[in-house]
Curated annotation (Swiss-Prot):
Belongs to the AAA ATPase family. GO terms for cellular component: cytoplasm; nucleus; proteasome regulatory particle, base subcomplex. Keywords: ATP-binding, Coiled coil, Cytoplasm, Nucleotide-binding, Nucleus, Proteasome. It comes from Solanum tuberosum (Potato). It is found in: Cytoplasm; Nucleus. One of its GO terms (biological process) is proteasome-mediated ubiquitin-dependent protein catabolic process. Residues 1-30 are annotated as: Disordered. The 26S proteasome is involved in the ATP-dependent degradation of ubiquitinated proteins. The regulatory (or ATPase) complex confers ATP dependency and substrate specificity to the 26S complex. GO terms for molecular function: ATP binding; ATP hydrolysis activity; proteasome-activating activity. Residues 32-80 form a coiled coil. The keyword Membrane does not apply. This is 26S proteasome regulatory subunit 6B homolog. ATP binds at G201, P202, P203, G204, T205, G206, K207, T208.
């Protein structure tokens, strides 16, 4: 039996109703497309920046490691023994001409870490011993024997420790101490204070000791140098040391420069025949130039001491350089009494000791010889195992240091 298939006349009504996922109103407009594209672009840029940041961080780490290695290399170069040289001329930012201690000049490379502003003519520099490259700039006073005396290094000599010399004490205090402590007094009067003081006289009369007392009593910086220290082996070193002394004094003003035995470099000029004599004369000319270049507003005073004032160059002695000249003669009777009193103040003298006997003797003796007499008397008492100094001890000391018996020289006849 055949069955006939009956078709549904309305199949569309039997199908489930379907709706599109987005309606026409849900389709993004052109403005939203632009914002979406911009968001994607910014996201890509952010990812690129993050990649760049990681790259920069890695590069920074590498550069820091290289910087540390370069610093260690520079320290290694500067830590090895360096050759001391003198900067002469800058060619460009990377090269210069320097002079070595052997007298030769070199065209060298400058280390990139060196501060170019410190490279001035005559500056002391450190050179690599293999390549002679300029690897360090030394302080101005690094290779100089000139230095300031600190408060603990200053002599403990006071004015009371110097017997006699009352006039000399007053004059040096007026010329050196007073202008540094009460400069306004000279302004009110309308005069310029002395620039320099010359102490001259026989040996042992207290010139150096008085300068020590000035260093003790003043708060100014004190620079002490002996004239023979300026005479160096190589040409130009002496004048450079003179410049260093005055530069150091100006940097630490108020300051006092004491040059002992100045006759070693300040003798009268003559027609020099040797290089050494010409170098000494160049030192003198540099000294004259530095003293002429003094500004009165800079509180720097110069004290010079010598035993031979008659041999000094007249240009140094003229007013304007050494304005005050203080003579230290051999002590007279009153001065000898004061020196004996100072020297024996701490000594254990016997009641029989009469110092006036030694003061009244006509022998011309210096203050240093009086000190030696007292020292010898004390040594003689120690030799005899005594705690009291007797007159015979002083007599022994006097004969030892002053009176020489003629029989001592019969051997040479």
């Amino acid at each position: 039996m055949a069955t006939a298939m009956v078709l549904d006349p309305k199949p569309a009504e039997k199908l489930p109703a379907t709706r599109p996922e987005t309606s026409i109103t849900d389709v993004p407009s052109d403005g939203e497309d632009d914002l979406y594209a911009r968001l994607k672009s910014l996201q890509r840029q952010l990812e690129f920046i993050e990649i760049q940041e990681e790259y920069v961080k890695d590069e920074l780490k590498n550069l820091r490691r290289e910087h540390l290695r370069a610093q260690e290399e520079v320290k290694r170069i500067q830590s090895v023994p360096l050759v001391i040289g003198q900067f002469m001329e800058m060619i460009d930012q990377n090269n210069a001409i320097v002079g070595s201690t052997t007298g030769s000049n070199y065209y060298v490379r400058i280390l990139s870490t060196i501060n170019r502003e410190l490279l001035k003519p005559s500056a002391s520099v450190g050179l690599d011993r293999h390549s002679n490259a300029l690897v360090d700039v030394l302080p101005p006073e690094a290779d100089s024997s000139i230095s300031l005396l600190s408060q603990s290094e200053k002599p403990d000599v006071t004015y009371n420790d110097i017997g006699g010399c009352d006039i000399q004490k007053q004059e040096i205090r007026e010329a050196v101490e007073l202008p540094l402590t009460h400069h306004e007094l000279y302004k009110q009067i309308g005069i310029d204070p002395p620039r320099g003081v010359l102490l001259y006289g026989p040996p042992g009369t207290g010139k150096t000791m008085l300068a020590k007392a000035v260093a003790h009593h003043t708060t100014a910086a004190f620079i002490r140098v002996v004239g023979s220290e300026f005479v160096q082996k190589y040409l130009g070193e002496g004048p450079r040391m003179v410049r260093d002394v005055f530069r150091l004094a100006k940097e630490n003003a108020p300051a006092i420069i004491f040059i002992d035995e100045v006759d070693a470099i300040a003798t009268a000029r003559f027609d020099a025949q040797t290089g050494a004599d010409r170098e000494v004369q160049r030192i003198l000319m540099e000294l004259l130039n530095q003293m002429d270049g003094f500004d009165q507003t800079v509180n720097v005073k110069v004290i010079m001491a010598t035993n031979r004032a008659d041999t000094l160059d007249p240009a140094l002695l003229r007013p304007g350089r050494l304005d005050r000249k203080i003579e230290f003669p051999l002590p007279d009777r009153r001065q000898k009494r004061l020196v004996f009193q100072v020297c024996t103040a701490k000594m254990n003298l016997g009641d029989e000791v009469d110092l006036e006997d030694y003061v009244s003797r006509p022998d011309k003796i210096s203050a240093a010889e009086i000190t030696a007499i007292c020292q010898e008397a004390g040594m003689h008492a120690v030799r005899k195992n005594r705690y009291v100094i007797l007159p015979k001890d002083f007599e022994k000391g006097y004969r030892t240091n002053v009176k020489k018996p003629d029989t001592d020289f019969e051997f040479y006849k």
